[in-house]
């Protein structure tokens, strides 16, 4: 069972989770949402670490998402795939991880309707496809 409770807990840093990585699809979706060119969106809201584009981190936010305001996602309808697929990430589909971390920190676990195995598999596929896309779009600096 899972239903998002809108707690914003998945958007705050707990030291074990880091960047919100962005695929090309995510970048285009955000650019459209903000009515900015890709270049302008990247300049205003992104950083590159180890060749990967991710949402910028601000020191004053202590690792929390830049789009989290009053425990609410201000870009929910255009949120990136990494956020859309939470908590059904491939890395989380381990009973130990799920029981020790995910179910403890995500109040939506165990709430709402039962999510079918078919739906979970679709989400896992989206997560995997996004990871592949992000890896393929890595920016390798010239030496």
What are these regions (language model features)?
Residues 1-143:
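Short loop/turn segments that flank or connect secondary-structure elements
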């Amino acid at each position: 069972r899972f239903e998002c409770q809108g707690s914003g807990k998945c958007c705050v840093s707990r030291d074990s989770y880091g960047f919100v990585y962005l695929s090309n699809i995510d970048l285009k979706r955000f650019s459209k949402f903000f009515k900015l060119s890709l270049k302008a969106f990247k300049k205003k809201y992104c950083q590159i670490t180890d060749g990967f584009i991710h949402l910028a981190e601000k020191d004053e936010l202590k690792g929390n998402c830049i789009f989290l305001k009053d425990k609410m996602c201000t870009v929910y309808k255009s949120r990136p795939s990494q956020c859309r697929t939470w908590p059904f990430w491939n890395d989380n589909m381990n009973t130990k991880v799920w029981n020790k971390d995910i179910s403890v920190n995500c109040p939506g676990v165990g709430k709402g309707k039962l999510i079918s195995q078919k739906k979970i598999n679709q989400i896992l596929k989206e997560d995997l496809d996004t990871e592949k896309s992000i890896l393929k779009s890595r920016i390798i600096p010239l030496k």
